[in-house]
Amino acid sequence: KKNSNKLVLGDGNINSPIMLIGEAPAAEEEKTGLTFMGETGDLLKKMLHAIDIKKQNIYSTYTVNFRPPEDRKPTSTEIKRYSQFLQKHITIIKPKIIILMGSTAMESLTGLNSKISAERGKWKEVIVENSTYNIIITFNPSYLLRAPENKKHSWEDLKKIKQKIIDLNLDI
């Protein structure tokens, strides 16, 4: 946790059927203690709005709950260190849908260490403490700010999320 001042645990509706898991907080998130702030948060809000979801109506957290030095990607060691905490977090929230945003979230919950482009947009199931959860992997909004050409793929993923919400008759 060198260079990190504050843990960013999660925020939003703890009773939501949707849990969104990102990579790790950046400077603004660390400062405010809230998830997905600044430009990344603005893009996430627009993405969710496109499928009729308000960010405050879902629960969001991070794979690694501290800001890595120089905002670098969390290491596999850091991901493993926080994975038990993340799994406990999931069992407390008990979401019907988990949206994994980015490769760090994907690696933590699925063990996959492949490219997001190969795994995104597919519904999978993951077992956490004897309960099965529906997950979908998509790009992290911070990545989309750097690689906007992938927004079209995220839109496809968002439409699948919207359809799953309808199929499961979830109230968001």
Listing of model-derived features with the role each one plays in the protein:
Residues K1-I172:
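A polyanion-binding, active-site-adjacent surface
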